[in-house]
């Protein structure tokens, strides 16, 4: 969700040229996702993240688009849910890797020990074990997130 719309759109030509291509659709509670984007300053080209209404529409566009592509290429697109990964990391990661025809390794659970460079907004987070505090984080600010709760029909 944190990229331009073209970045989250699988290309039909690519899917035809590389029929075994795997797309990972990583989903998270929409309010947590949108609020996380809103409070993160992104570089050029991410102006939609400065407005909660724009972020909400962008998120919905992503869901509609990926669901469309999933209808065309159901075996290529795997949806993984953030909250489920946090609750059952080994099981969910194994299912994802199985979909990608990749063997599970214990290092998948120890990703935070890697010393590889990371150039994303989550560069500090990937240096820590998975944590549950991001689940329903939006509720701490629910009084200021009426736009999001309305878009996604959530009660405070």
Task: Write out the residue ranges for each language-model feature.
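A general structural signal for short secondary-structure junctions and capping/turn motifs
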Residues: 14-17, 70
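Alpha-helical elements of the RecA-like P-loop NTPase motor core of helicases
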Residues: 9-12, 35, 94
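Short, solvent-exposed loop/turn segments at secondary-structure junctions
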Residues: 5-8, 29-32, 40, 83-87
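Conserved phosphate-donor/acceptor-positioning beta-strand/loop module used by diverse small-molecule
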Residues: 17-39, 96
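Glycine-rich phosphate-binding loop used to anchor ATP phosphates in small-molecule kinases
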Residues: 1-15
């Amino acid at each position: 969700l944190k990229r331009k719309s073209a970045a989250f759109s699988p290309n039909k030509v690519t899917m035809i040229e590389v029929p075994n291509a795997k797309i990972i659709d990583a989903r998270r509670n929409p309010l947590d996702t949108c609020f996380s984007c809103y409070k993160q300053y992104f570089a050029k080209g991410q102006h939609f993240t400065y407005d909660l209404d724009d972020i909400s529409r962008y998120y919905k566009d992503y869901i509609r688009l990926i669901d469309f592509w999933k209808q065309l290429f159901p075996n290529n697109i795997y949806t993984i849910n953030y909250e489920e990964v946090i609750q059952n990391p080994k099981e969910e990661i194994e299912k994802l890797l199985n979909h990608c025809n990749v063997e599970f390794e214990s290092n998948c659970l120890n990703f935070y020990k890697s010393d590889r460079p990371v150039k994303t907004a989550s560069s500090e987070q990937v240096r820590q074990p998975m944590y549950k505090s991001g689940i329903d984080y939006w509720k701490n600010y629910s009084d200021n997130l009426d736009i999001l709760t309305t878009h996604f029909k959530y009660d405070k």
